[in-house]
């Protein structure tokens, strides 16, 4: 299963760097059929990038929600927010399907973070623990392909 992993966020803003950190760790595993992109935010160009992949996984920090992380399928939405400079996973997926006839399934992994306001701060210890668990989960998910394990409740 060809997979595109897009890790996004600002590593210079504490826990906002969780998405890129996860993407870097997964890329280092050297898994087959995996392409990793890292950026500060999603944009409309990511819709083109999804063409030819079976699955796209969007990795980002989560300001709220389940700890240590959540993993869910993205439903493409016509009303999803996006502009020429930033987009949501649902919006990018909808564009990929509408403009490029991409058959990709989309998923979001949101890693719970706690501190986003201090520029230059590293990822907090609590968020690092969440990140470790998210890396283990995603590595297993990518290794087993179609049989995606359930995320923690």
Q: Where is each model-derived feature located?
A:
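Residue-level signal for beta-strand positions within conserved beta-sheet cores that form or flank
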Residues: 1, 32, 102-105
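Glycine-rich beta-strand-to-loop/alpha-helix junction loops that act as flexible
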Residues: 6-10, 112
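Generic structural signal for well-ordered, non-membrane alpha-helical segments
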Residues: 15, 19, 85, 89, ...
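Glycine-rich, phosphate-binding/catalytic loops in enzymes
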Residues: 22-24, 73-76, 126-127
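Helix-loop-strand module that forms the ligand-binding subsite of alpha/beta enzymes
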Residues: 62-108
């Amino acid at each position: 299963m060809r997979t595109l992993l897009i890790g996004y966020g600002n590593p210079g803003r504490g826990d906002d760097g969780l998405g890129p950190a996860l993407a870097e760790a997964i890329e280092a595993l050297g898994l087959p059929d995996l392409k990793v992109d890292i950026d500060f935010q999603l944009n409309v160009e990511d819709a083109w990038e999804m063409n030819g992949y079976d699955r796209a996984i969007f990795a980002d920090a989560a300001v709220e929600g389940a700890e240590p992380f959540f993993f869910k399928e993205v439903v493409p939405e016509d009303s999803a927010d996006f502009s020429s400079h930033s987009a949501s996973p649902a919006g990018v997926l909808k564009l990929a399907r509408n403009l490029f006839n991409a058959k990709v399934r989309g998923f979001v992994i949101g890693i719970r973070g706690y501190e986003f306001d201090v520029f230059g701060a590293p990822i907090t210890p609590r968020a690092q623990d969440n990140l470790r668990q998210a890396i283990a989960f995603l590595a297993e998910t990518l290794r087993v392909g179609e049989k995606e394990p359930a995320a923690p409740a």
